[in-house]
From Swiss-Prot:
<feature type="site" description="Important for substrate specificity">
    <location>
        <position position="174"/>
    </location>
</feature>
<dbReference type="Pfam" id="PF02545">
    <property type="entry name" value="Maf"/>
</dbReference>
<feature type="active site" description="Proton acceptor">
    <location>
        <position position="89"/>
    </location>
</feature>
<keyword id="KW-0546">Nucleotide metabolism</keyword>
<keyword id="KW-0378">Hydrolase</keyword>
<dbReference type="InterPro" id="IPR029001">
    <property type="entry name" value="ITPase-like_fam"/>
</dbReference>
<feature type="site" description="Important for substrate specificity">
    <location>
        <position position="90"/>
    </location>
</feature>
<dbReference type="GO" id="GO:0036221">
    <property type="term" value="F:UTP diphosphatase activity"/>
</dbReference>
<comment type="function">
    <text>Nucleoside triphosphate pyrophosphatase that hydrolyzes dTTP and UTP. May have a dual role in cell division arrest and in preventing the incorporation of modified nucleotides into cellular nucleic acids.</text>
</comment>
<keyword id="KW-0963">Cytoplasm</keyword>
<protein>
    <recommendedName>
        <fullName>dTTP/UTP pyrophosphatase</fullName>
        <ecNumber>3.6.1.9</ecNumber>
    </recommendedName>
</protein>
<dbReference type="GO" id="GO:0005737">
    <property type="term" value="C:cytoplasm"/>
</dbReference>
<dbReference type="InterPro" id="IPR003697">
    <property type="entry name" value="Maf-like"/>
</dbReference>
<dbReference type="GO" id="GO:0036218">
    <property type="term" value="F:dTTP diphosphatase activity"/>
</dbReference>
<comment type="similarity">
    <text>Belongs to the Maf family. YhdE subfamily.</text>
</comment>
<dbReference type="GO" id="GO:0009117">
    <property type="term" value="P:nucleotide metabolic process"/>
</dbReference>
<feature type="site" description="Important for substrate specificity">
    <location>
        <position position="21"/>
    </location>
</feature>
Length: 210
């Protein structure tokens, strides 16, 4: 007679992200995790290079899967115990262009002035590789954000705060940039970098306890 014992749940997962926001969001829903970050010899930024003519949704999905596969290989090489691996990537798009992390202050100011008074899309893809090494179908969260008109000086002061650096589109919705945001339509957590509804569904499928 087949056993009716349910599969064991994993008490923790591996989070392959340095983002404090993603860590805070996982903690918000009670997920326990261990960081699984790139080694010094890994070129993590190379995974984020755009392909010619690549659409934003295809880009963010491809990058997320590539990061997940790299993280899984890192886990296997480390000899750590098997457990699901979570990866996410966020990008901002407007007029068909992908706005990643600004390279410098001028780049950040250029991005922000481009967003001023307009609506743009924020895409976050989430991928989970289960403890057996299988990639679950990635999830994609798409939200719209409208920036109110603001002066170039206002954006320049925001850039001087340092907050735009390391953020797709050169802003953080949970930070000082909130003063520029007129409205959003979609997932607030997705705009922050980890859509919790989609993430929770993937973690349940991977048998993560939370």
């Amino acid at each position: 007679m087949p056993s009716s014992t349910p599969p064991a749940l994993f008490p923790t997962l591996y989070l392959a992200s340095q983002s404090p926001r993603r860590q805070e969001l996982l903690q918000q829903i009670g997920v326990r995790f261990e960081l699984l970050l790139p080694r010094p010899d890994e070129d993590a930024e190379a995974l984020e290079a755009e392909l010619p003519g690549e659409a934003a949704d295809a880009y963010v999905r491809r990058v997320t899967i590539a990061k997940a596969e790299a993280a899984r290989a890192r886990l296997v090489a480390s000899g750590k115990p098997a457990s699901p691996v979570l990866v996410a990537d966020t990008t901002v798009t407007i007029d068909g262009a992908i706005l990643g992390k600004p390279a410098n202050a001028d780049d950040a100011l250029s991005m922000l002035t481009r967003l001023a008074g307009r609506e743009h899309a924020v895409l976050t893809a989430v991928a989970v590789i289960d403890a057996d090494g299988e990639l679950l179908p990635p999830a994609l969260s798409r939200s719209s954000v409208r920036f109110a008109p603001a002066s170039r000086d206002a954006y320049a002061r925001y850039v001087e705060s340092g907050e735009p650096f390391g953020k797709a589109g050169a802003y953080a919705i949970q930070g000082r940039a909130a003063e520029f945001i007129e409205r959003i339509d979609g997932s607030h957590s997705g705009i922050m970098g980890l859509p919790l509804f989609e993430t929770a569904a993937l973690l349940r499928a991977a048998r993560v306890a939370f």
